[in-house]
Regions:
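Short, compact, well-ordered microdomains
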Residues: 61-95
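Short, conserved turn/kink motifs that form compact alpha/beta structural patches or helix kinks used as
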Residues: 32-74
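A short, Trp-centered hydrophobic/proline-enriched beta-strand micro-motif
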Residues: 22-30
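Short, 15-30-residue, compositionally biased linear elements
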Residues: 21-22, 62
Length: 95
């Protein structure tokens, strides 16, 4: 049985940025949540991602708390709440 490794969420985000800065890609998962509808709970697994530039707060509310990325398999820009990130490159994320 493989031993589970852990990483702090904000350390994972810094590592995502480092990987993205050199054109690399990473895998991660997060819990979906929509503040407007109050719905969520589904887990999204992104197998090939790269961070993209953050949208300013005046365009997207609370953007400082979101992770902006491109899903490379779907070639779509997406975002998620940073604190809802579950895994990064096989490591479990903790707060």
């Amino acid at each position: 049985m493989e031993k589970q490794t852990y990483i702090q969420v904000y350390d994972a985000i810094r590592e995502m940025q480092r990987i993205s800065d050199v054109g690399g890609e990473f895998t991660f998962s997060f819990v979906k949540y929509n503040r407007q509808t109050g719905k969520g709970g589904d887990i999204a697994r992104i197998s090939r991602a790269r961070l993209r530039k953050k949208t300013p707060n005046d365009l997207i509310e609370n953007s400082d708390y979101k992770l902006f990325f491109t899903d490379l398999d779907a070639n779509m820009p997406r975002n998620c709440w940073q604190i809802l990130i579950l895994t990064f490159n096989g490591q479990k994320c903790i707060l």
